[in-house]
Amino acid sequence: MSNICQRLWEYLEPYLPCLSTEADKSTVIENPGALCSPQSQRHGHYFVALFDYQARTAEDLSFRAGDKLQVLDTLHEGWWFARHLEKRRDGSSQQLQGYIPSNYVAEDRSLQAEPWFFGAIGRSDAEKQLLYSENKTGSFLIRESESQKGEFSLSVLDGAVVKHYRIKRLDEGGFFLTRRRIFSTLNEFVSHYTKTSDGLCVKLGKPCLKIQVPAPFDLSYKTVDQWEIDRNSIQLLKRLGSGQFGEVWEGLWNNTTPVAVKTLKPGSMDPNDFLREAQIMKNLRHPKLIQLYAVCTLEDPIYIITELMRHGSLQEYLQNDTGSKIHLTQQVDMAAQVASGMAYLESRNYIHRDLAARNVLVGEHNIYKVADFGLARVFKVDNEDIYESRHEIKLPVKWTAPEAIRSNKFSIKSDVWSFGILLYEIITYGKMPYSGMTGAQVIQMLAQNYRLPQPSNCPQQFYNIMLECWNAEPKERPTFETLRWKLEDYFETDSSYSDANNFIR
């Protein structure tokens, strides 16, 4: 009878975390209140941590890359309730259960949990990540193919060059580079080529380091639905810059989490208008968009709390010593990243209205993200150098499409026009477009089909993309998805791959 009871308990224990025998007196529990989870939607799902995470609140669970976790509740998209399945490697005590950011874990034994699998990243992004100095020859990753849905590509670091191979797939199952050697799984594929190069440029070494850590979708589980937060929880540490709407600060939330804080000038927006727009903005989630975390709107100055990008705006970055030394490869890459974020907004039928280098932010490891999307609709602006009065509103005339200037009607195609001006800012290292011209003169010249001339250092191929964005007919301008792949494939003909049979074209 005792054996039957023991087996029954072993079966039920994972589903009854509140009664777990692991929560005994010998374990230091940082947050006893977090031991009892909400009603679980699915049980028994085991996950692997992809990145380190340090708890931000008493309800959170700290973990390290490689830790095994059991997810007990997935009620909220961005934050799951989970428990540790193993003791910490250094022997220290730890909280047993708590909330975790869902984009930091992958289901155990899944392809996404493999350290060498990078998901749906483009070829140029794969090259950039493999070329980080921490990676050595033989470092590799497998990614979803850009051109062939459901298929995969292998990217390998060979000295100072990244080589790419298409992993072919049989209809009946199996993966191969050449038909003389077929593998039933990608794990077998990787295992084989880590033992021998067998036709590859080099033998596979260690997986590419995952240096780019995603931002959690919210500050914490508590701010998922209640994102009007106490301003006393925010410390303003260092002013990063100032603009027409207020100041941007590096801040600290809850004494744990670095954030960016935009403090708005009193009267710069109507709080109710902003909250309506922000509710939409908070649900827009993409790696190339700045994540809106929380707001403080009950008194002036209004705070907008977002993820922190330590290098400031792209405009300032291009004009400083570091940005002025970048070359065409990096310029095309930053343009492609912005196009990727804008393609997501395009897919969600959302319009930016103020796309410019000043509204793109620069992070670590050459990461660029679109900021302030949608805010132009609610800001009351007074910077006459950028925003000029048209039809009783103020517009950034030098970045605004002619049809939007005429009628004050914005569309994703007017954003495409602005993207063309952004390309001009990128290639000229942050120069003011239409330098020396007033807004009124720009409007007059555009009516005569004038376009910004090709900068002296601008390749014809790059300038052609700009001209496409400035098509007088909005419907004839490219989509952001088209702009994304054009920029990601910009150097396609300049490849340095040695194996023409396996090189991805």
From Swiss-Prot:
Q: Which Pfam families match?
A: PK_Tyr_Ser-Thr, SH2, SH3_1
Under the heading CDD domains, the entry gives: PTKc_Frk_like, SH2_Src_Frk, SH3_Src_like
Question: Got a GO cellular component term for this one?
Answer: azurophil granule lumen
Which catalytic residues are annotated?
Answer: 354
Database matches in Gene3D superfamilies: Phosphorylase Kinase, domain 1, SH2 domain, SH3 Domains, Transferase(Phosphotransferase) domain 1
Spell out which residues are annotated as carrying Phosphothreonine: 178
Q: Which domain of life is it from?
A: Eukaryota
Every SH3 domain range: 42-110
SUPFAM superfamilies in alphabetical order = Protein kinase-like (PK-like) (SSF56112), SH2 domain (SSF55550), SH3-domain (SSF50044)
Q: Which residues form the Protein kinase domain?
A: 234-491
Keyword Cytoplasm recorded: yes
Record InterPro entries? Kinase-like_dom_sf, Non-receptor_tyrosine_kinases, Prot_kinase_dom, Protein_kinase_ATP_BS, Ser-Thr/Tyr_kinase_cat_dom, SH2, SH2_dom_sf, SH2_Frk
**Residues modified to Phosphoserine:** 37, 40
| Primary role | Non-receptor tyrosine-protein kinase that negatively regulates cell proliferation. Positively regulates PTEN protein stability through phosphorylation of PTEN on 'Tyr-336', which in turn prevents its ubiquitination and degradation, possibly by reducing its binding to NEDD4. May function as a tumor suppressor.
Similarity-based family: Belongs to the protein kinase superfamily. Tyr protein kinase family. SRC subfamily.
Would you tell me the protein name for this molecule?
Answer: Tyrosine-protein kinase FRK
The gene it comes from is: FRK
